[in-house]
């Protein structure tokens, strides 16, 4: 947020200063945090190297093979979390809010690695996180080879080819005829992943410079050497254009009051 405030209010709009922001930066504005000194709709969005959709993994030896199993269970699964601001915590609350599930969240782990270790030890059974680390690093690479965990739900708009049997939350919404307001709440929380790791220029940056920056960024993301290096590091390059990010920022902020109030409650604001 400090970086966003600086780029918005302090940095000169000359095309020489850019900021890489948190993908969830719009949420602070949406729920009305007093520290916010920016309007995400007025940034000049340049581009993002990836989307950051979330997923929920569960130990394969647990009795929970689907979200429906969680709903029917008399004892809810235990999911680890770093705290109430973490992706793991927010995803669990979203599933409870929109799909009438119960998930027991164990708070206080210092970081994701400690949660994963707790899963291995059997202290907890599940964790929510973004897809990039799940597909790109240990222990997940080994876990997937050993079928140690299953992914129960994916937060993207379409299924991920690496987990083709895992439904998206939107498929489940369609199946269960989830009300429109609940879908909007999910969109506000989950579609932040479409921002990925976005670059922005200050408001007031000349349009011709914004175009130069967007074009240069798009060319860089398509550079074969960069794509090859990313593959070596088991990283996905799925660039999002500045124009698409601009539209997304407008959509995320333009929510009806009922949705905003539910998002505030979900985030504990």
List where the protein language model places each region.
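Residue-level detector of anion-binding/catalytic polar loops
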Residues: 102, 125, 236
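Hinge/capping helix and adjacent helix->loop/strand transition within the periplasmic-binding protein
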Residues: 6-17, 25, 29-121, 173-184, ...
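An extracytoplasmic/periplasmic, membrane-proximal ligand-sensing/linker region
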Residues: 145-151, 174-175, 204-269
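Glycine-rich beta-alpha junction loops
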Residues: 23-24, 108-112, 131-134, 155-159
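Paired acidic/hydrophobic, glycine-rich loop segments that form the ligand-binding mouth/hinge
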Residues: 14-21, 78-80, 124-134, 151-152
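Short helices/loops that flank or line small-molecule/ion binding pockets
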Residues: 1-13, 93-94, 98, 113-127, ...
């Amino acid at each position: 947020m400090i970086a966003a405030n600086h780029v918005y209010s302090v940095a000169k709009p000359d095309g020489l200063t850019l900021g890489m922001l948190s993908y969830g930066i719009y949420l602070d504005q949406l729920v009305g945090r007093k520290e916010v000194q920016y309007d995400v709709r007025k940034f000049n969005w340049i581009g993002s190297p990836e989307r950051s959709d979330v997923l929920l993994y569960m130990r394969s030896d647990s009795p929970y093979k689907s979200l429906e199993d969680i709903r029917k269970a008399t004892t809810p699964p235990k999911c680890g979390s770093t705290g109430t601001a973490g992706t793991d915590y927010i995803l669990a609350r979203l599933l409870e809010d929109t799909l009438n599930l119960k998930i027991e969240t164990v708070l206080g782990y210092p970081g994701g690695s400690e949660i994963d270790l707790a899963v291995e030890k059997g202290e907890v059974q599940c964790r929510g996180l973004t897809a990039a680390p799940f597909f790109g690093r240990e222990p997940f690479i080994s876990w997937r080879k050993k079928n140690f965990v299953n992914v129960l739900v994916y937060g993207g708009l379409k299924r991920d080819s690496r987990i083709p049997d895992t439904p998206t939350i939107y498929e489940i919404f369609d199946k269960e005829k989830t009300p429109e307001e609940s879908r909007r709440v999910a969109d506000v929380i989950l579609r932040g992943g479409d921002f990925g790791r976005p670059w922005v220029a200050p408001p007031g940056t000349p349009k011709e410079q914004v175009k130069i920056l967007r074009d240069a960024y798009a060319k860089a993301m398509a550079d074969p050497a960069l794509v090859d290096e990313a593959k070596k590091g088991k990283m996905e390059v799925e660039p999002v254009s500045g124009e698409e990010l601009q539209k997304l920022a407008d959509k995320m902020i333009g929510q009806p009051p009922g949705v905003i109030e539910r998002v505030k409650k979900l985030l504990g604001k």
